[in-house]
């Protein structure tokens, strides 16, 4: 065990640094996203819950919770990793990491840890806040665990990739505001995609976040707009593709080496 820890000393040190970066600014990185998402539950769930009684037989204020948790977690893990990697490139700190006796997969994994830690803290905190006002069950814990794991792998790797390719802070923010946020809302956070008319119903099935969101909702509530097997399969393929892409970048040094 001691020998294993010694061989992975660089991985552990860089992972601790990324996690500490999140915890040091917890009011901004964790508390603020929890508060903003909890306001969605209060404003949309409790205010509209009196008018929109049920969706798929589930109270509206309960129905929106899994989607809001998913949206908060994927935004957090992407934002954290894209910002961390871009800043490391901008400050030339990443050059020191690349020169360290670490394997490419170790660097890739360590730089992803911060986003995963941040997302898990936000997800747990938001669920705790939601349970204070609504009764949210967990019907399928294994499916929920798999869905959350795939979501974090997918968007933590995606954040690393964008951080490597970005040429300015605007580029990282662009992906959040123009890609992730709209796709999250259009993925069915506040509604069931089955209620949409054609062709919007079919178009929604081309949205990757739609599958993640429905897999998480199935884990919580036992309901989904699409087969949970298909949701996990699509999410797994996308996560594997993002991991392969980010691993290739670190293995080849593309856009990393000065």
Where are the model-predicted features located?
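Hydrophobic transmembrane alpha-helices and immediately adjacent juxtamembrane helices
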Residues: 1-142, 146-258
């Amino acid at each position: 065990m001691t020998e294993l820890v010694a061989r992975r000393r660089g991985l552990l040190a860089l992972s601790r640094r990324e996690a500490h970066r999140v915890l040091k600014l917890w009011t901004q990185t964790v508390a603020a996203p929890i508060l903003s998402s909890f306001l969605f539950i209060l404003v949309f769930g409790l205010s509209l819950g009196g008018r929109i009684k049920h969706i798929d037989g589930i109270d509206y204020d309960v129905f929106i919770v899994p989607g809001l948790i998913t949206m908060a977690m994927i935004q957090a893990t992407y934002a954290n990793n894209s910002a961390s990697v871009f800043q490391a490139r901008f400050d030339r700190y990443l050059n020191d990491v690349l020169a360290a006796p670490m394997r490419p997969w170790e660097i890739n994994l360590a730089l992803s840890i911060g986003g995963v830690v941040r997302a898990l803290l936000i997800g747990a905190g938001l669920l705790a806040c939601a349970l204070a006002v609504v009764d949210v069950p967990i019907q399928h814990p294994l499916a929920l665990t798999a869905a959350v794991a795939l979501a974090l792998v997918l968007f933590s790797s995606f954040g690393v990739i964008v951080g490597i390719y970005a040429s300015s802070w605007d580029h990282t923010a662009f992906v959040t505001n123009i890609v992730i946020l709209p796709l999250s809302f259009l993925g069915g956070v506040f509604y069931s995609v089955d209620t949409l008319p054609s062709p919007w119903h079919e178009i929604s099935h081309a949205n990757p976040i739609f599958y993640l969101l429905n897999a998480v909702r199935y884990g919580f509530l036992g309901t989904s707009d699409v087969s949970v097997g298909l949701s996990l399969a699509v999410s797994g393929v996308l996560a594997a593709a993002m991991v392969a892409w980010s691993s290739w970048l670190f293995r080849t040094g593309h856009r990393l080496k000065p």
